[in-house]
Amino acid sequence: MKTMIRVTLVCALSALLPVWAEAPLELVSPRNGETVCTLRPEHRDFLAKSREERRALLVDPVWRKRMVDEADSFPLPVTLEWKGGEGPFAVKVSLAGRTVLETNLAARTVNVWNLEIARRYDWTVCSAGACARGEFRTLDLAPRVMYVPNVGNVRDLGGRIGIGGRRVRQGLVYRSAGLNTNAVPKEPRKKGVVSLTPEGLRIATVDLGWKTDIDLRGDAECWGMEGSPAGAGVKWLHYSSSHYGGLRRKAGQDAFVKVFKAFLDERNYPIDFHCKGGADRTGTVAYILNALLGVDDEELVKDWEFTCFHYPKTKFSHKGYYDELLAVFAKLPGSNTREKVESYVKGLGFTDADLEKFRRIMLENP
């Protein structure tokens, strides 16, 4: 009798085991096939407004300060979440077969930064021999804003649609604020302080693979510098540059010649170019590069305007800044912005072959 009771109890307990066992792995977020966006709501709201509305906001000091304080120029991560299983968990995220994140952790959530826009990503979570797989997409909405700790206004030049409907390649050219502070100009003079944190340095040089740092600042701003704040493995090209109407003057033209030659050397990629805040000198170069690639006028102005999330002062506005940039090219030969900017660049001595080489580097294949 005792044996029968004992056997019955064991069988009853065995029947309950599936209830007690760890639930199977299940991906929670993003949902399979979901489209996610790494722009902040404030960024998306601004980009959705008309050009007239955006122009008005750039001269609104209350709005400008609030945007810098509340949104700034940093993106949101894509947060991966899952449930069930027993840690540690092996997590892998890939893009077209290329691994962009591979980590092991005990938690059931992880943030993924700096994903390309308009892409499909696959992700897998494995635990104790069991795996759950899913996919998600990133929204087709530029700019691709980048997370590089303690460096503001970092954006991928790529992601927009250019000539012939070809997308500008992502991961090749970045624009940013300075990678260090400006030097102290008065005696006793002091070199600028590196802005990149250890994490930011890893992201810039390992994750993003920066090879060249094109510094558009003046000699006084870069006093004492002998190389890139991103380290000895990053080539530092210091080309003191002009902005806006300065493109009409010889000094501004000579500087742009040096800058564009750097973009024609495939060994330099990936490239980050910047001035102090990534606004005026950087915005001027970005405008020319994007225009040569055939990015349309609305996207050209949005790329320039986006600096408003990093720089709160209303002097950075269209009147006297962007309008002056447009005036540089307005009377040049050409029926559209791309052709007018081509005329400017070819007037500096570059050839059709140079422009085609730049486009071959920067535009995705048809």
Question: Across the structure, where does each feature detected by a protein language model lie?
Answer:
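Ser/Thr-glycine-rich phosphate-binding loops at phosphate-binding pockets of nucleotides
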Residues: 277, 281-282
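Cys-dependent protein tyrosine phosphatase-like superfamily
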Residues: 21-272, 284-366
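Bacterial N-terminal signal peptides
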Residues: 7-16
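Positively charged n-region of N-terminal signal peptides that target proteins for export
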Residues: 1-6
